[in-house]
Amino acid sequence: MTHLDKTAGSATSGSAEEFVGEIREARPRDYARIAELAGQLGYPSSADEIAKRFDGMQHSNENAVFVAQLGGEIAGWVAVFVYRVVEADARAEISGFVVDERYRSQRVGMHLLARAERWAREKGCRAIGLRSNVIRDRAHAFYERHGYKHVKTQKSFRKDL
């Protein structure tokens, strides 16, 4: 196993910022576990549904999903994409982020977040954002500890088609 530092990708030797594991791009064999963790996030999905979503994303180099693997198990994942709009410069957006309840407060989320941020910088993005349900106070505190600032409160609207 690889020791990862807080840049979530470079090898290092013993520091308080480490965990024993690997941050890597998601693979088809991860779909069932990604689906299981999506359920913990509040978005129940099957492995087949995850596979279909990945199939739709794999033709773009502006989407990525990274997993944290610890001891042979996927402990969490983060999905990130480049968000392009007319009215502002491109930025990265984290569309999904979950760490298994059993692995929280063990630096897994920190390493996943760092990997998503590094990917965004590699894509030329100068900012990264995310949206988080108002009830997720613990997640909000985590984001703030890692340099994210609450920039606005808004209502979200959706229409089924």
Language model feature labels by segment:
Residues 1-29:
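Conserved N-terminal entry element of GNAT/NAT acetyltransferase domains
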Residues 2, 153-160:
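Active-site/acyl-donor-binding loops of N-acyltransferases
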Residues 3, 25-90, 95, 113-115, ...:
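Acetyl-CoA-dependent GNAT
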Residues 97-104:
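A short, internal acetyl-CoA/4′-phosphopantetheine-binding micro-motif in the GNAT/acyltransferase core
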Residues 105-118, 141, 145:
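Conserved acetyl-CoA-binding loop-helix of GNAT-fold acetyltransferases
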Residues 120-132:
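Conserved GNAT acetyl-CoA-binding A-motif
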Residues 130-139, 158:
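Conserved beta-strand-loop-alpha-helix junction that forms the acyl-donor binding cleft
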Residues 144-153:
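Conserved acetyl-CoA-binding loop of GNAT-fold acetyltransferases
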